[in-house]
């Protein structure tokens, strides 16, 4: 496990408790392979772990901070970043960007952000089927994330691989909606 990741959602802290007990052998890895050595993400993560403030003024690298006080302006900025600015300025395709929000409700919550991003990145088209679900609309081409474990779903990939179960955090793209 990673001691710097978010804690468990449910009760308990099994991994942390086991490591602190000293009963289970543990090794700490110090070399980072996911980001480049000169990554501002890495530098700022280390700074935060040491109780220091991250560098927020440099917007020319892989870590930057944009202050938005009005919630509507924040949503507009997120849409601009995903639709135009990150793909054009950093070469990151929109389908590789993940937006995190600490809440579901409100102007800046996941429900509203998802609606705004869907309208910008995957608008309705005659060639795309869609399905209303409660107060949401799912559309072919939408990126989706599973929010609860479902062990009973049987799935098949394009390459023929099959399996059962989809799990909290699994991400995919809606390929087809049955008529």
How would you label these PLM feature ranges?
Residues 146, 174-177:
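A generic structural signal for residues embedded in beta-strands
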Residues 143, 168-171:
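Conserved beta-strand residues within beta-sheet cores
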